[in-house]
Amino acid sequence: MAADQQVTDSTTEEELPSDRIADLVELIVCGLVDDEDSVSLDVTDREGGTLIEIECAEADAGKVIGRHGRQIKAIRTIARALGQRVGSSVDVEVLG
């Protein structure tokens, strides 16, 4: 390996994979809603996996869920796929 090349880990020791997944979920949700300041995520690491609860303004909950649940289904699919990559199950819920 050349002296000018460095190998770095993309996650710090303090940051859990579930935190990185939650950051991505928050980024997606903030892009969907009108009131970004009302968006908050509660991440709970459980024995069986991770639960990410999305709280947003009541008027924006429909935008996060989407017509026939398409938006939240897509968000769940992305979060679960990332969770599988790190060996964890991830569930996403909207509290509205």
Where are these regions (language model features)?
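RNA-contacting regions in translation and RNA-metabolism proteins
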Residues: 1-60, 74-96
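Glycine-centered tight-turn and secondary-structure capping sites
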Residues: 65-69
